[in-house]
Amino acid sequence: MGGFEANLSAKETLENLGFRVSFSEHYLESDMLSSSSIKSRVADLHAAFADDSVDAILATIGGFNSNELLPYIDYDLIAKHPKIICGYSDSTAFLNAIFAKTGNLTYMGPSYSSFKMKEGQDYQIKAWLNAMTKSAYDLVPSQEWSSDPWYDPTQPRHFMPTEWKIYNAGKASGTIIGGN
């Protein structure tokens, strides 16, 4: 399910979309929480923001312990080197902190590992590319959803039709702050 080798198909998916994928210095480190140390994760985050060849940063996965990073993040460095940073679930702790401390936009969206999904990938890719590459676009809801373990290719996926109810029809624009 997890680990570097199991997620290489995510790299292939992103490369097939025309992206050059690189990995942080401490990407292969793993402790008892399937993470690396706070020091290593912060160093990797800072290195990615400081590197002019990096245009975007994808969180590897949600990261239930991502809140540990908050006191150690160099928000001045991030403000001076704005770039796309995207993740979901518990990654929203540092996404919202970066927005709050720097004003830089952050993206609640797929993590690197979710690009290994075989089913449900078409909608994810289209929605993500719209957010990453367009200044404005129409947000089109997915026609289906699933809460299956997408990360486990041995488990069957069961998609359900999306049922939408409009409470107040119209258009809106503005800043959305969300999270887990």
List the predicted regions and their residue ranges.
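Generic secondary-structure signature for well-ordered alpha-helical cores
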Residues: 16-20, 50, 99-104, 130-141
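Residues at alpha-helix caps and immediate loop-helix transition turns in enzyme cores, especially N-
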Residues: 3-7, 69, 98
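Conserved anion/nucleotide-ligand pocket segment
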Residues: 106-180
